[in-house]
């Protein structure tokens, strides 16, 4: 099947920044066959089997890439606030929790994010399915949801094999013996078991519909033995796959590297062989100058997640410094329990605004064009699809979105990328073509019965809220006081940051003391 998109304002997103207004895009099968000025379009006729899409008053963009998301959190939107990562984690992923969800529940949770992704212009998502070892029902449910929705998805098999008490510095010494024994009673699967489970998922789903990829994802170096990290590296090399890992999201994690290894977590990952061009580091906030140099030298990528970094108070990723060093940077929304959205346009807006604080030197700011690249070509490389997606160019996959130029945020049309970042909402996304297939037309998703899905999701999500969330919070409360002590102890310590000893990333201020305290007097 061929499609001709005619008369659009085409922003190709290619390296040259090509724009055609009006422009045409010819799609043949799952590939872009031609793009250029409408006046130079190949001669076509509707009778020749080509679907004609009249795209006058439409802005054509490359499909957006959400390079880091956790769809398994979608029933927890609005459940948390004012919690730093370490305390949020024990609520959303409680260490004392024997409950498992059905495959259908996993399917529905993923479908929530899939629908929101399509509606916000995402055509490719990297879903970090954060279920240890990724239980078969979890990955099967997620993969089926993406297959049915028509999205391109790179799904991770999450891995960690360290007991909960050994994933945070100082924690084991704080937790009383009876509680520690209970926490140690059900250890995670071994490194060998998790590698074997990855092989099962890879054989079952990788390459499905030409759109589904399966990749390894050690949850974080502090949660993984070196054997498991090396196992993930070996899987990545054997199958030529990306490997994604959460690293240095918080100050506590920066302290963890020093306590566990006597070096930064990035330096430790380099020692076990993980830093390669296939490696993506999620968050990357509490970096030293040496860390940045290592990431650049090894050809690594990072994902920037401004919404969750802000909500969790984690800090500000040094994106400009990373880009200037030659590190590839992609954009993500992160989980829907930390950013509370899978809407990539919200992340584009946050990323385009956040880096204008912290310095008056405008050369260090990020602009809308910078963040648009993160959400297109940057995401393509991070997901292992460089040259395949991320731009409207002949030979690339036919992932194209059409936005309504008559949306209020585009009137007048001064600069479509700046207005994408600062002016519009996802309601402006009208049509989505993924892998050469029209998945959404005039805001109606063609691949599924959205009303029926919404009704089923509402019932399942309400049951989760009523029955599951209270149990999760109860499990968290049993360890919260000890995790808070770890957090308070770690955040009071000095750690090196971007080559300088300081406590907080740019934009973080030290707590101010009153005059009496500064002078050593009682207030």
Please state what every model-predicted region is.
Residues 271-278, 320-407, 423:
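His/Asp/Glu-enriched, well-ordered alpha-helical/loop segment
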Residues 75-106, 162-188, 251-276, 298-301, ...:
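Active-site gating loops and adjacent loop-to-helix segments of metal-dependent hydrolytic enzymes
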Residues 1-23, 27-28, 373-523:
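Active-site microenvironment of metallo-dependent hydrolases
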Residues 77-129, 133-152, 193-208, 458-466:
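Alpha-helical scaffold segments that flank or form the walls of functional sites
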Residues 8, 25, 30, 57, ...:
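Divalent metal-coordination and catalytic microenvironments
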Residues 2-3, 10-61:
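Histidine-rich, glycine-flanked metal-binding segment
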Residues 137-284, 290, 511, 515:
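Metal-coordinating catalytic core of metallo-dependent amide/deamination hydrolases
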């Amino acid at each position: 099947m061929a499609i001709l998109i005619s008369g659009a304002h085409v922003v190709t997103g290619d390296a040259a920044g090509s724009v055609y207004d009006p422009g045409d895009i010819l799609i043949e099968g799952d590939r872009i066959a031609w793009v250029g000025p409408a006046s130079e379009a190949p001669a076509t006729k509707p009778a020749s089997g080509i679907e004609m899409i009249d795209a006058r008053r439409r802005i054509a963009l490359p499909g957006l890439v959400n390079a880091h998301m956790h769809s398994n959190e979608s029933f927890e939107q609005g459940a948390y606030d004012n919690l730093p990562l370490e305390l949020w984690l024990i609520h959303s992923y409680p260490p004392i929790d024997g409950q498992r969800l059905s495959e259908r529940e996993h399917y529905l949770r993923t479908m929530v994010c899939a629908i929101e992704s399509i509606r916000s212009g995402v055509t490719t998502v990297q879903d970090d399915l954060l279920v240890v070892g990724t239980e078969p029902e979890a990955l099967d449910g997620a993969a089926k949801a993406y297959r049915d929705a028509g999205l391109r998805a790179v799904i991770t098999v999450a891995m960690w094999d360290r007991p909960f008490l050994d994933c945070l510095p100082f924690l084991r010494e704080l937790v009383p013996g009876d509680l520690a024994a209970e926490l140690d009673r059900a250890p995670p699967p071994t490194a060998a078991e998790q590698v074997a489970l990855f092989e099962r998922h890879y054989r079952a789903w990788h390459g499905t519909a030409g759109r589904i990829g399966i990749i390894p994802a050690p949850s974080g170096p502090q949660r993984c033995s070196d054997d498991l990290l090396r196992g993930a590296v070996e899987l990545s090399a054997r199958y030529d796959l990306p490997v994604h890992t959460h690293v240095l999201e918080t100050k506590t994690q920066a302290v963890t590297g020093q306590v566990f290894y006597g070096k930064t977590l990035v330096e430790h990952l380099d020692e076990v062989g993980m830093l390669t061009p296939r490696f993506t580091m999620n968050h990357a906030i509490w970096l030293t100058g040496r860390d940045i140099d290592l990431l650049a030298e090894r050809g690594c990528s990072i994902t920037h997640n401004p919404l969750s970094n802000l909500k969790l108070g984690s800090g500000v990723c040094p994106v400009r410094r990373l880009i200037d060093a030659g590190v590839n940077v992609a954009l993500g929304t992160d989980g829907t329990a930390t950013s509370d959205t899978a809407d990539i346009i919200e992340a584009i807006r946050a990323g385009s605004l956040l880096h204008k604080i912290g310095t008056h030197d405008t050369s260090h700011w990020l602009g809308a064009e910078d963040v648009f690249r993160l959400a297109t070509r940057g995401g393509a490389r991070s997901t292992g699809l460089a040259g395949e997606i991320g731009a409207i160019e002949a030979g690339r996959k036919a992932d194209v979105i059409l936005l309504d130029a008559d949306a209020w945020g585009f009137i007048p049309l001064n600069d479509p990328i700046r207005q994408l970042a600062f002016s519009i909402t996802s309601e402006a996304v009208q049509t989505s073509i993924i892998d050469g297939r029209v998945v959404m037309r005039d805001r109606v998703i063609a691949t599924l019965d959205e009303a029926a899905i919404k009704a089923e999701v509402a019932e399942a999500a309400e049951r989760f809220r009523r029955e599951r969330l209270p149990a999760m919070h109860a499990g968290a409360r049993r360890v919260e006081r000890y995790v808070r002590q770890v957090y308070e102890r770690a955040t009071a310590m000095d750690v090196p940051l971007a080559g300088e000893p300081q406590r907080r990333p740019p934009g973080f201020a030290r707590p101010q003391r009153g005059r009496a305290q500064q002078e050593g007097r009682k207030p």
